[in-house]
Structures are given as C-alpha cells and as structure tokens.
Design a protein with these regions (language model features):
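Amphipathic alpha-helical "lid/sensor" segments that cap RecA-like P-loop NTPase cores
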Residues: 331-382
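Conserved beta-strand -> loop -> alpha-helix junction used to position metal-binding or nucleic-acid-contacting
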Residues: 101-107, 297-298, 367-374
Length: 451
C-alpha cells in the first residue's frame, strides 16, 4: 500500500484506497480508541486476562492458562476492526505476554466455500509456520501422534475419492517428527479444501466424523507449543486472531461458521479472538453461552441530540491530514463537512474523498464544495437505490426515535441495513442513525422526511 501523503489532486486517489487496512506502524494509521463511545480497549485486555500496569502487557500463565477465552469482536464493515486487531497483536506479542498468531482467512481460504474445519486447519498451519520461523521446537511425541492420525485420515480420504490423483499429504510416520513435516500436512489439506467440491466435502467429512479426536490433538498441540514457547522465552500463551469472517460469501455461511458450529467451537481450547459480522450481533445471547462478545462501534461524531462531538472531529481531521495535505481543501469547514458525512466510519469517509477527487475540477487543483456535492449526490442515490418501502418505513421510525431520544429495537430489517451500511451503529449498539449520505438521497428525502 502507498504510504505517501497526497500533495496534488492527482495523488489523492492512491492515498484514499478504502479497501486496504492500515496497520499501526503505517504513516496513515490513526488511533480512534479514545473516541469510540462506550467501547474501551482495556475491556479487551481484561477479557484476555492481560495485565496492563506501567504501560506494559503481561499474561500470568500459572494463573490463567487453563481458562482459554474465546472472544468475538463484532462491528460494522469499515469500522477499523482489522487495524484494531493488528494493534492488539503488536501490543500483546511479547515474551511476557502472548505469542500472537494472526489468521486472515480472506488471504488463505476460499471465501465462496469455507467451513469451520477449514479455519481450524488454517490455524494449525499458521501456528506451525510461526513456531518454525521463531525456532521454537515442539515435543516430538505430539508431532508423531499427529503424523499417525493424519496418515489414517489420508487413507480414508483417498479411498473415498477412489484414489483420485492429486491428494497426497506426504505423511510418513517413519520420517523425522519435525515441524516442517506437519506444516506440509496442514498445507496439503488446506489446498485440498480449495479443490473440487467433492474433494473438499470428503476431507471435511473425514475430519468431522472424528472431531473429538481432532480437537484433542489440536488442544494437545496447543499445550505442548505453550510449554515450548515459555521455555524458549518467546511467549507465555498462544493467542489466535481470526480476521475476515465478515468477507465470506453469504450471511448463511457466516451464521453456519459461528452459530451452527458452536459445539465444535467449544471443544477447541485456545485463546482466540474472532471478528463477528454485524448481522450476527443479534445472536449475542446465544454466542455468549460459549464465549464473550463485545461491540466495536463506529466513531460517534454527532450525539443523538444533534450536537457535534468535537474530539471525534479533531481525530478525523488528523486521519485526513495524514493522507491528504489540508491545502488541497477549499476550506477548513469543507474538511468538517467531509467528516460529518463519513458518519464516523473511516472507510465511508475515504469513499467520499475518493468520489470527490473524481469530480474535482483539474484546473482548480483542489477539492471544493462543487465536487463535494456532486460526490454526495452520486453516492446517496447509489446507496439508497434499492431500498424497499418496508425499509424506508423502518428508517422513518428510527429517525423519529432519535428525535425523541429513544433507542431503536433490533430486528432483521435493521440487521440487513446495518450490514449494507444504510444504518450506522454507535456506543454499545443502543444508538443507531441513518447513514448521513443516505439521508441526502431523493428516496429518503421524499419517503422519510416527506419533502
């Protein structure tokens, strides 16, 4: 990703790419942690049993290793979850705290066809790779047991596939019990899961049919790796960060990964953070039965009563100034307008900036009110184009609730509109408002506001 700030109109497009996450060591990174309403970073650390005294981060393995917390961080698209998770990884990955293993499923799995078994195999592969890279040896006994177990699965799978060419784990219980040996096994399974539908289904079925054994091996491997990490002075406990769940193909697939697989999720004993798609926040009570859920909201820039949250505006001004020199804006007030219509979402703000740069007058060489309004009009009507009357009626109710200072109840329509960023959510989810860009659309103006 480009790390150069835009000083000319032509450079803006590359500086505002909104589908590329920014990490804490990147020049564009902005810390929003103190302006996210009721969300507090320290809550995450407490859930993970991390002590944060004297500005450091530590984990007491003797006291907390047996607890193995499963934690879901739920939030809307474009709220900055990936950047936030990367910050946690940076803070916690240290000898006196966690050995953090980040698994971005979008980069490694087939997002059109992914199941929980696929994620688990990916977790094993990533952990083994990171251990190998850190020169951390693991007990040979667990490696031998895994080799033997997967050799049996290979025999079953090849028989079910009638000897189909191309599926070969390379398992040999006589080979040295090295990390690279099982790393190859996990890699080959992952490749097999992304092959034909028949092959993927056969592999998954073989693993699912013996899931208690699989989970037992997984958990033993985690514990042996934890012991090795402590002895090597590389970490006190493994922490998985699983990102990208919201980018899988369908809501049905995402629900299956979390809700339908809850029994298998319970059987895996490792400290883990999952991102939780916004539409599954309605299942919070179910998920809380086997894990902990926290809402990661947009930045609240306007109170329910309509007054600006000045601190949030200042942070977003910093966010913009790191990417675009402020001299490229017609006025400081125009910068505030961009922020206001971003609705507290870093990604939505970048989307508006990109559109405005597209409509900007090259002869002027700046972003002015004219290109800003053209961008808003285009984005507003595109975003609202397929709103049904049922959704418009619900938006009107939410608008009236906010005027009266009331919280709006959740339902499936609200869930759909949160997923599509028609609605935006703040604080702990109790405050919802219409995306300010949508409010400008002809449909909203006519059907909701009656203008």
């Amino acid at each position: 990703m480009q790390s150069s700030k835009a000083f000319t109109l032509d450079e803006i497009d590359q500086a505002v790419k909104f589908n590329e996450p920014v990490y804490p060591d990147h020049p564009f990174y902005t810390d929003f942690s103190h302006v996210r309403g009721d969300f507090r970073e320290k809550v995450v650390y407490r859930i993970l049993n991390v002590k944060t005294s004297d500005g450091g981060f530590s984990f007491d393995a003797d006291l907390n290793s047996g607890e193995k917390k499963l934690f879901f961080l739920g939030g809307m698209k474009g709220s900055g979850k990936t950047s936030e998770l990367t910050k946690y990884a940076r803070n916690l990955h240290r000898p006196e705290c966690y050995f953090v293993v980040t698994c971005n499923i979008e980069e490694a799995l087939d997002m059109n066809d992914v199941e929980y078994m696929d994620v688990l195999i990916f977790q094993l592969e990533r952990l083994t790779y990171e251990l190998d890279q850190a020169y951390v040896p693991v007990d040979k006994g667990i490696i031998k047991r895994m080799q033997a177990w997967f050799q049996q699965r290979e025999t079953e799978i090849r028989a079910a596939l009638k000897g189909e060419l191309g599926f070969e784990l390379g398992v040999n219980v006589e080979s040295p019990p090295l990390l690279k040996t099982i790393l190859n096994i996990f890699g080959q399974i992952k490749v097999g899961l992304q092959g034909s539908k028949e092959r993927a289904t056969t592999i998954r079925s073989s693993l699912k049919n013996r899931f208690p054994d699989f989970a037992n091996l997984f958990n033993q491997y985690i514990e042996e790796a934890n012991l090795s990490l402590r002895q090597a002075g590389k970490g006190q406990e493994i922490l998985y960060i699983i990102d990208g769940l919201e980018k899988t193909m369908s809501a049905e697939m995402r629900r299956k990964l979390v809700i339908d697989e809850s029994n298998r999720l319970r059987q895996i004993k490792a400290y883990t953070i999952f991102t939780l798609p916004i539409e599954l926040m309605k299942e919070r009570q179910k998920i809380n039965q086997f894990s902990t859920v926290e809402s990661f909201p947009y930045v609240k820039i306007i109170e329910r009563q309509g007054n600006d949250v000045e601190m949030a505006f200042l942070v977003f001004e910093e966010f913009i100034s790191k990417r675009i020199d402020l001299s490229l804006f017609e006025s400081k007030e125009l910068v505030r307008k961009f922020i206001r219509f971003g609705g507290g979402s870093p990604r939505e703000l970048l989307r508006i900036l990109e559109a405005a740069a597209f409509f900007a007058d090259e002869s002027k060489g700046i972003l002015d009110e004219t290109c800003f309004q053209e961008a808003l009009k285009r984005l507003a009507n595109q975003t609202a184009q397929y709103l049904t009357q049922e959704k418009l009626d619900r938006l009107k109710e939410i608008h009236e609730d906010n005027l009266a200072g009331r919280s709006s109840p959740f339902d499936d329509l609200v869930g759909e509109m949160l997923e599509d960023i028609i609605l935006m959510e703040y604080n702990d989810g109790s405050y919802k408002r219409v995306n300010p860009v949508v409010e400008l659309s002809d449909l909203y103006q006519q059907r909701v506001l009656g203008k």
